[in-house]
């Protein structure tokens, strides 16, 4: 109980910080400081080590580099939950698993409905399938202890499965031309990490060094570099012996150490460099285009319809039960909150459209609007339900 309470408090603070940096990015992009903001995003950063040369603008270092650390953390969370947490049994995983599948299928179908026949636009079909766990849990934590713990666990489990789905989508659908040499180096790195895991090697620095080699090789391979973070996480031992012979969990220690860095530095920085939408160039006509409508309605309508609809079916068919001490309206309110795509949707958007501004920021504004509508509506639904409980 204390662990979950502490986690939710931290996510609440992180969510508030994400809002602040998003507003700051919007102000900078739409003021006399827009040139300085754009220049900051495209600041060249180079790394040379012998024959190795990596040169990218700051924006891509954040998206390819820092977000790999974020996905490393997600990988650690998934591993812990599957091995000993809320996803460790079929009974625990059934409802959030089915809900997560619905929350990916329905938004994707809505986007496809608006954009079928447009090959480039269709690259963005996965944008509305994502959920931003920091924001969604942040909204729940603002409602206090009156929201049943079972619903918070449901949302946490659903979000983790949702993130796992995003990882699979990135691996399958957002991979470019492959480099055989780089993939070979990545495979060798993974093999070494696997052997270290099986031999119970308990040296963090060894995993980090091999992990960096893995990241560089994946970056050069054509597979998105963030997947290196997930692969590395799955190779970190859940339990090892230290030099004194005592058992400890390297995976849990790394997860704990990274949480604050991810919540208060990496995700806010990602939001800052990606949420700077140029509102001056966006018209009502642009926002009524198939891509913005597919994204916005996919997030606000598709996510809640998919999560709640699939949950309702699973419960009515006897495959799962309603979370303890909750109601259908509470479950619906949480389902609406899953439409907060924000950072995850922005990330998929950057992959889908390769950071081009072909839609003149309308796609990104649609993400912000869909996420805001989901956050506000979900909060109000749960708030009214809370008041009803107070009165009773």
Swiss-Prot record:
Name assigned to this protein: Na(+)/H(+) antiporter NhaA
GO biological process, any: regulation of pH
GO annotation, cellular component aspect: plasma membrane
Higher taxonomy: Bacteria, Pseudomonadati, Campylobacterota, Epsilonproteobacteria, Campylobacterales
Catalyzed chemical reaction(s): Na(+)(in) + 2 H(+)(out) = Na(+)(out) + 2 H(+)(in)
Family: Belongs to the NhaA Na(+)/H(+) (TC 2.A.33) antiporter family.
One Pfam family cited in the UniProt record for this chain: Na_H_antiport_1
Gene that specifies this protein: nhaA
This protein's UniProt keywords: Antiport, Cell inner membrane, Cell membrane, Ion transport, Membrane, Sodium, Sodium transport, Transmembrane, Transmembrane helix, Transport
InterPro entries in the record: Na/H_antiporter_dom_sf, NhaA
Species for this entry: Sulfurovum sp. (strain NBC37-1)
Keyword Cell inner membrane attached: yes
Localization annotation: Cell inner membrane
GO molecular function ontology, one term from the record: sodium:proton antiporter activity
Membrane topology: Multi-pass membrane protein
UniProt keyword Cell inner membrane present: yes
């Amino acid at each position: 109980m204390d662990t979950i309470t502490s986690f939710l408090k931290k996510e609440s603070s992180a969510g508030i910080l994400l809002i602040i940096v998003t507003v700051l990015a919007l102000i900078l992009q739409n003021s006399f400081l827009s040139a300085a903001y754009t220049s900051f995003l495209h600041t060249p950063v180079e790394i040379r080590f012998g024959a190795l040369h990596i040169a990218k603008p700051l924006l891509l270092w954040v998206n390819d580099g820092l977000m790999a650390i974020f996905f490393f953390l997600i990988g650690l969370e998934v591993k812990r939950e599957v091995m000993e947490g809320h996803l460790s049994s079929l009974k625990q995983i059934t409802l959030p698993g089915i809900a997560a599948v619905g929350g990916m299928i329905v938004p994707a179908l809505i986007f496809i409905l608006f954009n079928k026949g447009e090959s480039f636009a269709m690259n963005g079909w996965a944008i509305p399938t994502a959920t931003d766990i920091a924001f969604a849990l942040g909204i729940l934590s603002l409602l206090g202890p009156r929201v049943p713990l079972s619903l918070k666990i449901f949302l946490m489990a659903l979000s983790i499965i949702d993130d796992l789905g995003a990882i699979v989508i990135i691996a399958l659908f957002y991979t470019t031309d492959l480099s055989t040499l780089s993939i070979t180096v990545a495979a060798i790195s993974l093999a070494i990490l696997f052997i270290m895991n099986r031999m119970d090697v308990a040296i963090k620095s060894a995993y980090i060094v091999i992990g960096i080699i893995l990241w560089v090789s994946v970056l050069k391979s054509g597979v998105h570099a963030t997947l290196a973070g997930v692969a590395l996480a799955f190779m970190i031992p859940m339990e090892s012996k230290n030099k004194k012979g005592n058992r400890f969990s390297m995976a849990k220690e790394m997860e704990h150490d990274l949480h604050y860095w991810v919540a208060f530095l990496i995700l806010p920085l990602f939001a800052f460099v990606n949420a700077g939408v140029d509102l001056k160039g966006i018209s009502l006509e642009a926002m009524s285009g198939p891509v913005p409508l597919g994204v916005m309605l996919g997030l606000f309508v598709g996510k809640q319809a998919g999560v709640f609809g699939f949950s309702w079916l699973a419960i009515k068919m006897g495959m799962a039960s309603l979370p303890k001490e909750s109601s259908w309206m509470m479950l619906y309110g949480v389902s609406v909150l899953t439409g907060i795509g924000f950072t995850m949707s922005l990330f998929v958007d950057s992959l889908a459209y390769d950071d081009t501004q072909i839609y003149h920021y309308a796609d990104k504004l649609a993400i912000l609007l869909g996420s805001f509508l989901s956050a506000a509506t979900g909060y109000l639904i749960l708030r009214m339900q809370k008041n009803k409980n107070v009165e009773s």
